[in-house]
């Protein structure tokens, strides 16, 4: 599995701000969007270009570069993934949205699916899954499995922080996906939370406890 940890200074700086205990909901939400935007820029760096003819500003036909045949659906894992969508839309405003509801049972740490609304022609689209945390990998593995069953063939993932345990589990289950993350953190604690992590990203994005 391709794993890319984005080590750009702006990404690391913004992520460092997000780790603070006293961070406000507004600030956490803003930084989530900004980091997602920077990571999306990295994800799309591998997209192929082709020449297209357009009518230029002087009224004459000119050749310009355009992304070649790429259709994209952004797939937020509810609910925390919703906070990352605007960061993707800054670069791909026409992206279709496919939503997957997946939560982690706090007692068993196992994923539980409760919702899926996917766009059409998944076999023709890049599916970009967004979720702030890759902890055990369970929810992400189930989401990828769901997308593949629906026809997805090209799946990329953006997370803010990832645990080594989750990366290993995801790689074993789906070695053909690509993971882009702002940080590979140290480990999972006994409650399966990422250390040092961000705490509960969903609660911090939506201002709930």
From Swiss-Prot:
Signal peptide location? none
Which E.C. number(s) belong to this protein?
2.4.2.9
Quick one: which pathway? Pyrimidine metabolism; UMP biosynthesis via salvage pathway; UMP from uracil: step 1/1
Query: In its keyword annotation, does this UniProt entry include Glycosyltransferase?
Result: yes
Q: Which domain of life is it from?
A: Bacteria
UniProt-listed SUPFAM superfamilies: PRTase-like (SSF53271)
Per its UniProt record, the required cofactor names are: Mg(2+)
Pfam families hit by this protein: UPRTase
Q: Which family does it belong to?
A: Belongs to the UPRTase family.
| Main function | Catalyzes the conversion of uracil and 5-phospho-alpha-D-ribose 1-diphosphate (PRPP) to UMP and diphosphate.
Q: What is this protein called?
A: Uracil phosphoribosyltransferase
Originating organism = Francisella philomiragia subsp. philomiragia (strain ATCC 25017 / CCUG 19701 / FSC 153 / O#319-036)
């Amino acid at each position: 599995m391709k794993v890319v940890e984005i080590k750009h200074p702006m990404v690391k700086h913004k992520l460092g701000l997000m780790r603070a205990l006293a961070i406000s909901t507004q600030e956490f939400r803003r930084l989530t969007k900004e980091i997602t935007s920077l990571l999306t820029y990295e994800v799309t760096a591998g997209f192929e270009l082709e020449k297209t003819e357009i009518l230029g500003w002087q009224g004459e036909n000119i050749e310009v570069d355009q992304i070649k045949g790429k259709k994209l659906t952004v797939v937020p894992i509810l609910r925390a993934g919703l906070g990352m969508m605007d960061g993707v839309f800054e670069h791909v405003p026409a992206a279709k949205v496919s939503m997957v509801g997946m939560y982690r049972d706090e007692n068993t740490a196992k994923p539980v699916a409760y919702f899926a609304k996917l766009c059409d022609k998944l076999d023709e689209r890049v599916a970009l899954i967004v979720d702030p945390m890759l902890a055990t990998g369970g929810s992400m593995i189930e989401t990828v499995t769901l997308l593949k069953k629906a026809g997805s063939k090209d799946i990329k993932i953006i997370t803010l922080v990832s645990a080594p345990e989750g990366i290993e589990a995801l790689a074993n289950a789906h070695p053909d996906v690509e993971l882009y993350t702002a940080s590979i953190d140290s480990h999972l604690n006994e409650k399966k939370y990422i250390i040092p992590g961000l705490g509960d990203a969903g609660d911090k994005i939506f201002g709930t406890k």
